[in-house]
């Protein structure tokens, strides 16, 4: 029997649901019940009826699912699949910032550890950050860990004062302006579409900025035929499915998050078969972190 059939058989037997982020390999996206960005998947994990969630993504995503649904079994097929940016934010550093800015609200990107979420007032994703910041009464915002998303939201909410953590996504940060200008010069009429995790100099020369789901929606609804896609190349799988006649260009021909690409069909099969790699979170810590995620769903729309 084909491994895909084995996975579907196991999923049915165990009553599990498979969630996959847009940055996963195409084979994982194809077998998942739901494919989406962090915010969409967190809502599915919170509201789904299934008691077993297999989260094909990175650790902070699976942890967020467990924080929101402690009664459910949450499995991360590859426990080593972490997030470099999430690891840049520390509890100690955040605690110090909170002391220095006692009146500030702490907004953490969902790409954060459970410990950082526990010290934050509200979580956000790239698709709901602006909404959340606008819904906060406080004028002073500690934003972490992504300085690029933070500066982007700061531009959108000029009445707020931001204290930005100096973190970044190594995949988006690596893109240079010269490469984008080169692609633009080679392809007349091409549209540049970027994720807000990109630096300001990249955002400033882009035609559209949005989360992964917003990028996909923009491209799908555009009559344009050529696009520079400045985010992890996993989104190309969905874009090509929906727009076969369209051309897509990735800077340097490659934008890969190694952690997102770790999970294979074999890993997914093994984790379901053996019910291994379960996410466990101390209950006191979970309750503290739950607050920030609960507030995200309340304020994020």
Swiss-Prot record:
Q: What is its main location?
A: cytoplasm
Q: Name one GO molecular function term.
A: 4 iron, 4 sulfur cluster binding
Q: In which pathway does it act?
A: Cofactor biosynthesis; NAD(+) biosynthesis; quinolinate from iminoaspartate: step 1/1
Summarize where iminosuccinate binds, as residue positions. Answer: 21, 38, 109-111, 126, 195-197, 212
Q: Which Pfam families match?
A: NadA
Q: Which cofactor does it need?
A: [4Fe-4S] cluster
Q: Give me the Gene Ontology terms describing cellular component.
A: cytosol
Q: Which UniProt keywords apply?
A: 4Fe-4S, Cytoplasm, Iron, Iron-sulfur, Metal-binding, Pyridine nucleotide biosynthesis, Transferase
The answer to whether the entry has keyword Transferase is yes
Q: According to its UniProt record, where is this protein located? A: Cytoplasm
Query: Which note does the record give on the cofactor?
Result: Binds 1 [4Fe-4S] cluster per subunit.
| Residues binding [4Fe-4S] cluster | 83, 169, 257
**According to the UniProt entry, where is the signal peptide?**
none
Question: Its catalytic activity?
Answer: iminosuccinate + dihydroxyacetone phosphate = quinolinate + phosphate + 2 H2O + H(+)
- Give the EC number(s) under which this enzyme is classified: 2.5.1.72
Name a biological process GO annotation. Answer: 'de novo' NAD biosynthetic process from L-aspartate
Read off the HAMAP family from this record: NadA_type2
Q: What's the family?
A: Belongs to the quinolinate synthase family. Type 2 subfamily.
Task: Name the job this protein performs.
Answer: Catalyzes the condensation of iminoaspartate with dihydroxyacetone phosphate to form quinolinate.
Name the chain's protein. Answer: Quinolinate synthase
